[in-house]
């Protein structure tokens, strides 16, 4: 059979499987491709193909991740699955696999386990906005009341991390049955029900181009007789010639007007998300603007120095530190295009952080940076990456 070409007319959504080790994340991923392949909406990927995930490097961090893609009637999905717990931690913190929603896999036989809790916490910290639950191995639990208790426990756990536990869809089934082609309600039917829940419960993400304009400043130069140009890649939104923008971060926020947009030496009416542009700025001196600041739609982003973050510290093998660090650690934090020094406060009861750990920390920067929740950063020492993090909440 000739491979069906994926139609790109459907909306695209990024999802992934999360949950405790051996609860069936990879089996479920394989089962989804199996069931949808029979409908011509996916290419079947077996357990071993997914489990032997290739290693990728993201910001100098080695992460093993498997990517599969499939379609439902409504959408096209890119789905990530990781073999090891550490890979999930790294993936979620670096944003290597940006998830618009996640399928939390919980074994009905075990109920929520430590990594179930940790993955829910990580999803909350790094801004995975929606979770759908697959209660796996339901065929191994004969007692209906026991199943209901496990479901209740999952809902309470989700609510305790500020997810809407009462509203989240929980689908009971058996990934293994689905993978083995069983057509009953715990097999194929459960997989189709799960995909229907994902279709309906996880909303389509807002496209980058529809968000408020933001461009990190990479370089600045002056053109005699014309003024100052800031160059960079538009991260989100659109900027049109004649629009007012703010210069945010490092110094006091300033307003200016974009009097020209240039790309590949051609003048344009606008710059859009993904474009590498030069923006000509009215009345701005060369020394008024620098790398590390951002151009943004007025009022859309503010500068901050103190925030909470979830961070992953590289192992020695990944090129990270060989020794732990303690409270008051002062590395550089690389945001978008520049390094800023900051001080790390460890949570109460944590004496030190070892290479390979992930930890929730409070960070105080010496210079304000334009930020919002979900912003990713690298932790560096003298230009060498020793960690990665994501802003989970802003303090001031």
UniProtKB/Swiss-Prot annotation:
<dbReference type="InterPro" id="IPR009001">
    <property type="entry name" value="Transl_elong_EF1A/Init_IF2_C"/>
</dbReference>
<dbReference type="GO" id="GO:0003924">
    <property type="term" value="F:GTPase activity"/>
</dbReference>
<comment type="similarity">
    <text>Belongs to the TRAFAC class translation factor GTPase superfamily. Classic translation factor GTPase family. EF-Tu/EF-1A subfamily.</text>
</comment>
<comment type="function">
    <text>GTP hydrolase that promotes the GTP-dependent binding of aminoacyl-tRNA to the A-site of ribosomes during protein biosynthesis.</text>
</comment>
<dbReference type="InterPro" id="IPR041709">
    <property type="entry name" value="EF-Tu_GTP-bd"/>
</dbReference>
<protein>
    <recommendedName>
        <fullName>Elongation factor Tu</fullName>
        <ecNumber>3.6.5.3</ecNumber>
    </recommendedName>
</protein>
<dbReference type="InterPro" id="IPR004541">
    <property type="entry name" value="Transl_elong_EFTu/EF1A_bac/org"/>
</dbReference>
<dbReference type="Pfam" id="PF03144">
    <property type="entry name" value="GTP_EFTU_D2"/>
</dbReference>
<dbReference type="GO" id="GO:0005737">
    <property type="term" value="C:cytoplasm"/>
</dbReference>
<dbReference type="InterPro" id="IPR050055">
    <property type="entry name" value="EF-Tu_GTPase"/>
</dbReference>
<feature type="binding site">
    <location>
        <begin position="81"/>
        <end position="85"/>
    </location>
    <ligand>
        <name>GTP</name>
    </ligand>
</feature>
<feature type="binding site">
    <location>
        <begin position="19"/>
        <end position="26"/>
    </location>
    <ligand>
        <name>GTP</name>
    </ligand>
</feature>
<feature type="binding site">
    <location>
        <begin position="136"/>
        <end position="139"/>
    </location>
    <ligand>
        <name>GTP</name>
    </ligand>
</feature>
<keyword id="KW-0460">Magnesium</keyword>
<dbReference type="InterPro" id="IPR004161">
    <property type="entry name" value="EFTu-like_2"/>
</dbReference>
<feature type="binding site">
    <location>
        <position position="26"/>
    </location>
    <ligand>
        <name>Mg(2+)</name>
    </ligand>
</feature>
<keyword id="KW-0963">Cytoplasm</keyword>
<dbReference type="GO" id="GO:0005525">
    <property type="term" value="F:GTP binding"/>
</dbReference>
<dbReference type="InterPro" id="IPR000795">
    <property type="entry name" value="T_Tr_GTP-bd_dom"/>
</dbReference>
<dbReference type="GO" id="GO:0006414">
    <property type="term" value="P:translational elongation"/>
</dbReference>
<feature type="region of interest" description="G3">
    <location>
        <begin position="81"/>
        <end position="84"/>
    </location>
</feature>
<feature type="region of interest" description="G1">
    <location>
        <begin position="19"/>
        <end position="26"/>
    </location>
</feature>
<dbReference type="InterPro" id="IPR031157">
    <property type="entry name" value="G_TR_CS"/>
</dbReference>
<dbReference type="InterPro" id="IPR033720">
    <property type="entry name" value="EFTU_2"/>
</dbReference>
<feature type="region of interest" description="G2">
    <location>
        <begin position="60"/>
        <end position="64"/>
    </location>
</feature>
<feature type="domain" description="tr-type G">
    <location>
        <begin position="10"/>
        <end position="206"/>
    </location>
</feature>
<dbReference type="GO" id="GO:0003746">
    <property type="term" value="F:translation elongation factor activity"/>
</dbReference>
<dbReference type="InterPro" id="IPR005225">
    <property type="entry name" value="Small_GTP-bd"/>
</dbReference>
<dbReference type="InterPro" id="IPR027417">
    <property type="entry name" value="P-loop_NTPase"/>
</dbReference>
<feature type="region of interest" description="G5">
    <location>
        <begin position="174"/>
        <end position="176"/>
    </location>
</feature>
<dbReference type="InterPro" id="IPR004160">
    <property type="entry name" value="Transl_elong_EFTu/EF1A_C"/>
</dbReference>
<keyword id="KW-0547">Nucleotide-binding</keyword>
<comment type="subunit">
    <text>Monomer.</text>
</comment>
<dbReference type="InterPro" id="IPR009000">
    <property type="entry name" value="Transl_B-barrel_sf"/>
</dbReference>
<keyword id="KW-0648">Protein biosynthesis</keyword>
<keyword id="KW-0378">Hydrolase</keyword>
<keyword id="KW-0342">GTP-binding</keyword>
<keyword id="KW-0251">Elongation factor</keyword>
<keyword id="KW-0479">Metal-binding</keyword>
<dbReference type="Pfam" id="PF00009">
    <property type="entry name" value="GTP_EFTU"/>
</dbReference>
<feature type="region of interest" description="G4">
    <location>
        <begin position="136"/>
        <end position="139"/>
    </location>
</feature>
<dbReference type="Pfam" id="PF03143">
    <property type="entry name" value="GTP_EFTU_D3"/>
</dbReference>
